[in-house]
Amino acid sequence: MNQVQTLTGPHIRTANTTRNIMLHVAISLMPALLGSIYFFGIRSLYITGFSVTVCVLTEYFWQKITKKPVTANDFSAVVTGILLAFNMPVTVPLWVVALSGIFSILVVKQMFGGIGCNFVNPALMGRLFTMVVWPGAVMQYVAPRTLTTTGFDAVSSATVLGTVKNGGEAGYSYLQMFLGETPGALGETSKLLLLVGFAYMCFMGIVNAEAALTYIATVIILTFIFGPAGLFTGDILLNLFGGGLILGACYMLTDYAFASRRGRLLYAVTAGIITAAIRIFSFYPEGICFGILTANCLGGALSLLYK
């Protein structure tokens, strides 16, 4: 019987070791981390460091207790910890970060066999876990520091997509959305810095950009066609830069190891359709988490159809 294996995104097409690959992914996330410190203050670094520590220690102690080979030094838990923090607002309590990290590593990753065996993205599942259990802790955002201000605004506010979804004005230019001068989670606001990191991964040859681009294209095309004021009235740049689409596409989209290009693209399109449908038809402004996780769950069936 053929074996179907999954890897936590980004999808790797190289003979490098897991440790080297994950090290490069972690390095690629550093521009966005530095950006989060600039936009939201030093607490961004504390949250990220704490999240990484919890994830690494959870993996280490679980593998020690279960007498499995210790892989806590392969940087995969580090990447999960960074991405988990990137999905949190700067105001999130540290105990929420801790419980989310334990859930991501222990339940989602290790109980399914560890890296390469978990069928959904651990960081995204950790995000979903906190959204369901403590929504108030992870869905309250603050306005960041900008080029014309000296610090972030501690008053809670909605994301740009959330504001527009509720009938308000975006309040930010497309350039501000691209640079990161908008309310949002720590690592999702600066599309520029995320793309710098993604370009680094592409340059190093450790990521397949085709699935990410297909996912992005699917979302922006569908949200443009089925716009809020009728057909072909959607705001392409708002949907591209106003939320977590870039972070989701570049770092969260788990790409199954399809042998065929068709299967890989269908997987990305599936995630894009679900994400767009949630943005268009539900009361949730984002849809990234639900879209990618649903596609993760369907990935096994798709991989059997398109080997």
What is the predicted role of each segment?
Residues M1-I21, S282-K307:
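Cytosolic-side transmembrane-helix boundaries in multi-pass membrane proteins
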Residues M1-V56:
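N-terminal signal-anchor module of multipass membrane proteins
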Residues G9, L57-P69, I105-G116, V196-G205, ...:
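C-terminal ends of transmembrane helices
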Residues I27-L29, T53, F75-L83, A98, ...:
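Hydrophobic alpha-helical segments embedded in the membrane of multi-pass proteins
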Residues G41-T53, T91-S100, M177, E181-K191, ...:
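Structural signature of hydrophobic alpha-helical transmembrane segments
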Residues N73-A77, I82-T150:
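Membrane-interface helix-loop-helix junctions at boundaries between adjacent transmembrane segments
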Residues G116-L195:
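Long hydrophobic alpha-helical segments that form multi-pass transmembrane helix bundles
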Residues F119, A123, I236-L245, R264-Y267, ...:
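Loop-to-transmembrane alpha-helix initiation sites
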